[in-house]
Regions:
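An N-terminal-biased, well-structured beta-alpha scaffold segment characteristic
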Residues: 1-38, 160
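Well-formed, non-transmembrane alpha-helical positions, independent of function
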Residues: 3-6, 28-29, 85, 125, ...
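Phosphate-coordination loops involved in phosphoryl transfer and adenosine-cofactor binding
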Residues: 12, 87-90, 161, 170
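Phosphate-binding beta-alpha-beta segment of Rossmann-like dinucleotide-binding domains, i.e.
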Residues: 33, 41-90, 105, 109
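Glycine-rich Rossmann-fold phosphate-binding loop(s) that bind the pyrophosphate
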Residues: 96-97
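N-terminal Rossmann-fold NAD(P) dinucleotide-binding loop
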Residues: 100-101
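Conserved beta-strand positions in the Rossmann-like core of class I SAM-dependent methyltransferases
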Residues: 115
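Rossmann-like adenosine-cofactor binding region
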Residues: 119-175
Length: 175
């Protein structure tokens, strides 16, 4: 709202969000002030799913931390060379729209077990992709990796201390 107020005297006519969610924009306030709000709901889906997958590989194999160590002139192969395989691990996807579905397909392709939570159930998608919907508590308890692709609906944090307490030790959260 502050940015909208500051721009009102200019030729400012539209806010465009490069992505799906509009939770960081006061849409009603913008509309009340004659400013259109647009987003790009389809454009980044594949890229975001690929990036989430890359983050999982990076965490599983210590790629980022090992790279940083090497740039500092250290060779700590024993410390960072072990890692874990993603195959056989469970990925919980919170938000099973376009991005979540693409990520689920990628994860299944490398042998991960995948479960999903979404407040909106898309008819037939469980059977089509072979990825079951589960309740949030079950997803939190059984997942080795959790990838979040949904905004908090109540304005609070989607992943909070209460939900973290329900997760496995060592879980990796991708957001």
């Amino acid at each position: 709202a502050k940015q909208i107020d500051e721009a009102k005297g200019s030729r400012f006519k539209c806010v465009i969000r490069a992505g799906v969610g509009l939770d960081n924009i006061d849409v009603q306030y913008a509309k009340d002030n004659g400013i259109e709000v647009k987003n790009t709901p389809k454009s980044p889906s594949e890229s975001v799913a690929e990036l989430a997958m890359a983050h999982m590989f990076s965490c599983a194999r210590y790629i980022s931390i090992a790279g940083h160590s090497m740039r500092e002139g250290k060779w700590e192969k024993k410390a960072y060379g072990k890692g874990i395989e993603l195959t056989g691990k469970t990925l919980g996807i919170v938000g099973f729209g376009r991005i979540g579905q693409k990520l689920g397909k990628m994860a299944k392709a490398i042998g991960m077990n995948v479960v999903a939570f979404d407040i909106f159930h898309i008819p037939g998608i469980e059977e089509e992709l072979g990825i079951p919907y589960v309740e949030m508590d079950e997803l939190l308890a059984k997942s080795d990796f959790i990838s979040v692709h949904a905004p908090a609906v109540d304005g609070g944090a989607l992943i909070n201390a209460e939900r973290i307490a329900k997760m496995k030790d060592g879980v990796v959260i991708i957001n």
